[in-house]
Amino acid sequence: GTLARYSAKNYGVKSLGVTIAEKQTEYAMGKIADEGLVGKAEVLCKDYRDIPNQKFDKISCLEMAEHVGVKNFQKFINQVRDLLNDDGVFYLQIAGLRAGFHFEDLVWGLFMSKYIFSGADASMPLAFVVKALEKAGLEVHSVENVGIHYSATIKRWYDNWMKNRDSVLAAYGDRWFRIWEVFLGWSVIIARQGSSTCFQIVSNKNLDAFDRTRWFGEDALGERSRPHTPGKTPSKPRAEA
């Protein structure tokens, strides 16, 4: 629920988050209440296929799409398209792989499938993701490969895991601790060397009426990077030569 809270608090939006984790939902709604954001931010405990049928100006998907699986990936992207306003923007952050056959990448994938994320087989090369977006009628605006940043983030996760060794062992036992120690440590190396990565993709509906000038100019840049001051109406983006 952090993104839902942050966007509502700093950008003045009405934000809706969705997760299948009951404990996460309870935690997020408690934080929303503590920060006085009830009515501005909300987190629902739902399967993505049960998201209320309404329209959104912006949709963000943070490393959830790979868990949809290859079989359901196109249906998921189609659903995002249907939930997005015609002038809306879709931000997709998804774990991915480099293209081509690489033996270590195969071993990594088999390990992940068996021990960590069974069925999460939609961590794919970029071409697979872009093809699904375009097939759904979306237009890719920008793509950034943040694999090195991803590696640095996972290193923090690994450090936290090792710092909490005793409490994890007490709660889950040695086998579970060792599996995740190997997984997180291996993930740091895999992401750093380029075997796995993370793509950040911004897209919009591929419509003639979509205003593509919104991506340019100081104001448009601020739309993405500068927090909103509550009570102040953000300026409209302007085109610059």
Stretch-by-stretch model annotation:
Residues A28-M29:
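Conserved SAM-binding loop
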Residues E63:
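Short catalytic micro-motifs in class I SAM-dependent methyltransferases
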Residues G1-G12:
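Conserved SAM-binding loop of SAM-dependent methyltransferases across substrates and taxa
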Residues R49-S60:
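A short acidic, Gly/Pro-enriched loop at the edge of an enzyme's catalytic core
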Residues V13-I20:
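Conserved SAM-binding motif I beta-strand of class I
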Residues E35-D50:
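Conserved SAM-binding strand-loop segment of SAM-dependent methyltransferases
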